[in-house]
């Protein structure tokens, strides 16, 4: 069992039940999945660029990413329907908690001038979105072997029904939100 998963079961659930007054521990919000997406627009001209992005994401997550394809043709962008334009990974279970642990304790503190992440990036249904500008904040990526610095979108899907519940869940995992 992952370290954060054990913390969730032993400390986070009782704290959330007490804070929000749930009648059952099953009502406590939980993290269902983490989706990491990397859009690689430069892949239109060179397919090798997308392969480098896929290998970076595989090193970061420990799971092979799925290539995302263009849904429709756009002539002004020189994109045809079905062109590979990026990659994404969906993490669940133990791998999800291990990635969250590495993100909070290792990767985010390595960001230059890091003050914390914005607390207003919730979608209204209890999901949180985080944008990372550089993939080199993860220790699995070797700086010398990186061909280009790419960003990624990280989406945290929870069972929380409100933003307040989702924020309390992520704060219980010591998620580094900015102090208002």
From Swiss-Prot:
Keyword S-adenosyl-L-methionine annotated: no
Biological process (GO), any one: translation
Gene Ontology terms: cellular component: ribonucleoprotein complex; ribosome
Recorded GO MF terms: rRNA binding; structural constituent of ribosome; tRNA binding
Keywords assigned: Ribonucleoprotein, Ribosomal protein, RNA-binding, rRNA-binding, tRNA-binding
Gene3D superfamilies, sorted: 3.30.1440.10
InterPro entries attached to this UniProt entry: Ribosomal_uL5, Ribosomal_uL5_bac-type, Ribosomal_uL5_C, Ribosomal_uL5_CS, Ribosomal_uL5_dom_sf, Ribosomal_uL5_N
Keyword Cell membrane: no
Cross-referenced Pfam families: Ribosomal_L5 (PF00281), Ribosomal_L5_C (PF00673)
Quaternary organization: Part of the 50S ribosomal subunit; part of the 5S rRNA/L5/L18/L25 subcomplex. Contacts the 5S rRNA and the P site tRNA. Forms a bridge to the 30S subunit in the 70S ribosome.
Family: Belongs to the universal ribosomal protein uL5 family.
Chain's role: This is one of the proteins that bind and probably mediate the attachment of the 5S RNA into the large ribosomal subunit, where it forms part of the central protuberance. In the 70S ribosome it contacts protein S13 of the 30S subunit (bridge B1b), connecting the 2 subunits; this bridge is implicated in subunit movement. Contacts the P site tRNA; the 5S rRNA and some of its associated proteins might help stabilize positioning of ribosome-bound tRNAs.
Identification of the protein by name: Large ribosomal subunit protein uL5
Organism: Hydrogenovibrio crunogenus (strain DSM 25203 / XCL-2)
């Amino acid at each position: 069992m992952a370290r954060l998963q054990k913390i969730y079961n032993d400390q986070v659930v009782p704290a959330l039940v007490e804070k929000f007054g749930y009648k059952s521990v099953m009502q406590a919000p939980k993290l269902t999945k983490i989706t990491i997406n990397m859009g690689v627009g430069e892949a239109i001209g060179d397919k090798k660029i997308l392969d480098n992005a896929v290998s970076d994401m595989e090193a970061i997550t420990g799971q092979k990413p799925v290539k995302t394809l263009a849904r429709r043709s756009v002539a002004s962008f020189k994109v045809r329907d079905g062109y590979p334009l990026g990659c994404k990974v969906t993490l669940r279970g133990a791998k999800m908690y291990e990635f969250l642990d590495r993100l909070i304790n290792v990767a985010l503190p390595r960001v230059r001038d890091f003050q914390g992440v914005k607390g207003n990036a919730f979608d209204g249904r209890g999901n949180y979105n985080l944008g990372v500008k550089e993939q080199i904040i993860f220790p699995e990526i070797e700086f010398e072997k990186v061909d280009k610095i790419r960003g990624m979108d990280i989406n945290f899907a929870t069972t929380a029904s409100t933003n307040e519940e989702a924020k309390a869940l992520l704060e219980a995992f010591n998620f580094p939100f900015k102090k208002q």
